[in-house]
Amino acid sequence: MTGVQTCALPISIFLHGGERIPTVLDLVRKGESFDLEDMARVGYNGVVCVEAGGPVPGLGCAGRGIIAALEELEKKGAYEKYQPDVVIYDVLGDVVCGGFSMPMRKGYADKVFIITSGESMSVYAAANIAMAVENFKSRGYASLGGFILNKRNVKNEEEKAAELAADFHSSVIAEIDRSDLVSEAEDMRKTVMEAFPDSTAAEQYRALADKIAELCGMGEEK
C-alpha cells in the first residue's frame, strides 16, 4: 500500500498498529541516506505500508511525493524483497498535477479503480480521473477497472454513480454502505478488517477485494 499523506492520520497508522511511519519525502528532505526498512513497514495481515508524504504547507508540489516514493521503492528493491501479490497506490482524486497520475503511467499500475460518492464534487472529481485514464489509453497505460460507490446516503446516489460509470462505458463494481464502524475503528487506530472482522462492513470489503482480484485476472489464483 503506497499512500499520500495529506491528513493527520495516514492509512499507515491504521495498518501498522497505530504507529506513524516516516514519509518518503520527510526522509528525502533530511538529506541523509536511508534504507528500505526506514520507509516501509509491515502492518496488519502482512500489508507493507509506505507513505509518500507531502510538501511543507504552501511550498512545493504534493505530486512530487508520489514520484519520489515510486523512485525510491524501485531504487531500494522493494518489489524484489517483499514480492507482493498486489500493489495498491492510494492517491488523491486530483489529476491536475501529473504526479498524482504517476502510478497509472510507466507500468506501475494495470487497473484504475475510482472511488466516489453521490455528492456532486465527488462525482466531478471521479469524472476528471476517468478522463485522465481515457487520455492515457492510447499510450498503453493503466485501464479503467470500474467505479466504487462509497455511499454518503445522498439523494439518488446509486443512479448518479451508475450514470457516471455509463458515461465512460464502465460499471459500478461495488457499493459500500456508510458505516459508523469506520470512525470507531479509526479511533482504535485500526482498520475495520482488524477491529470488526465479522461486521457487514468487513464483508463488503472482502467482496470488493474479490471483485478487484477477478477484474485483474487473479480470481483463479485465490
Language-model-derived ranges and their functions:
Residues 4-52:
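N-terminal phosphate/diphosphate-binding loop that engages ATP/GTP or pyrophosphate donors
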Residues 50, 69, 90, 126, ...:
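Residue-level signature of catalytic and energy-coupling elements of molecular machines
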Residues 64-68, 72:
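Glycine-rich oxoanion-binding loops at beta->alpha junctions
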Residues 75-86, 91-175, 184:
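Conserved catalytic-core segment of NTP-binding enzymes
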Residues 188-199:
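C-terminal boundary of histidine-terminating zinc-finger modules
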Residues 209-220:
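Short, hydrophobic alpha-helical segments
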